[in-house]
Design a protein with these regions (language model features):
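Bacterial signal peptide processing site
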Residues: 21-23
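N-terminal low-complexity, Pro/Thr/Ser-rich intrinsically disordered segments
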Residues: 25-49, 53, 138-145
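Extended ligand-binding regions for polar small-molecule ligands
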Residues: 33, 63-73, 138, 142-220
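Ser/Thr- (and often Asn-) enriched beta-sheet segments in non-cytosolic proteins
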Residues: 40-45, 79-86, 121-124, 140, ...
Length: 220
């Protein structure tokens, strides 16, 4: 049986500011011409969990996504010097990199969010109207602080920590929405296909309505 899921690409945000060896906080200079605060970042580290995806498509994604993302961010008054795209050998490895702060944004399946220890913070999701306990029957939800067995299950998740200013969230959210709305951006993200995404360094706040970027078929 096939179920159609949407890959939600909205609410993109960066930065896990660790105490030791972390990069400096992003500069927050004077307001831009539209009244929004200009943001400057040296590097945005984005990691995709490889799974069973085609290696050639991932290499194309690695080459094609950075300039599109840079342009989308620039339109939101955000200047990023470098977008670094890496690939994790597994969802668990990518989730760990997110927790450790070596990755700012991670594209992951929802299982990686639910099983993350320490737990990642839930920010925004798509409601699939299925109780979490039915969707993940082998998970002990009593041990999870943010998800209950009777909660609606969320196939696509945005999560993060508490360390980044809220002001960054809206800018990256709009940038990724714009990227996914463009033909070029959508085509590039199609190279990855199925994934949820997690965001490091963001307080638990719903930033904008989630936006459908891709439609997937998942075998059951």
């Amino acid at each position: 049986m096939k179920r159609i899921f949407s890959l939600l690409l909205a609410g993109l945000l960066v930065f896990l500011l660790a105490a030791c060896g972390a990069p400096a906080a992003p500069a927050l200079p004077d307001a831009g011409p539209d009244g929004s605060s200009a943001l400057k970042l040296d590097t945005l580290n984005v990691e995709f969990a490889i799974g069973e995806r085609d290696a050639d498509e991932l290499m194309r994604l690695q080459a094609e996504l950075p300039p599109l993302l840079l342009s989308a961010l620039e339109n939101e008054n955000v200047t990023v010097e470098t977008v670094s795209i890496t690939f994790g050998a597994s969802a668990e490895a990518t989730a760990q990199a997110l927790e450790d702060g070596s990755v700012d944004v991670a594209f992951l399946p929802s299982e990686a969010f639910v099983l993350s220890d320490p737990p990642l913070r839930l920010i925004a999701v798509e409601n699939m109207s299925v109780p979490a306990g039915e969707y993940f029957p082998d998970i002990d939800f009593a041990a999870l602080p943010d998800v209950a067995a009777d909660s609606p299950i969320y196939e696509n998740i945005v999560a993060g920590s508490d360390d980044t200013p809220v002001a960054l969230g809206a800018a990256f959210s709009r940038a990724l929405v714009m990227l996914c709305a463009s033909a070029d951006g959508n085509a590039v993200m199609q190279r990855y296909g199925s994934a949820s995404y997690l965001i490091s360094g963001h307080p638990g706040t719903l930033l904008t309505p989630l936006v459908t970027c891709l439609t997937l078929e998942v075998e059951e």
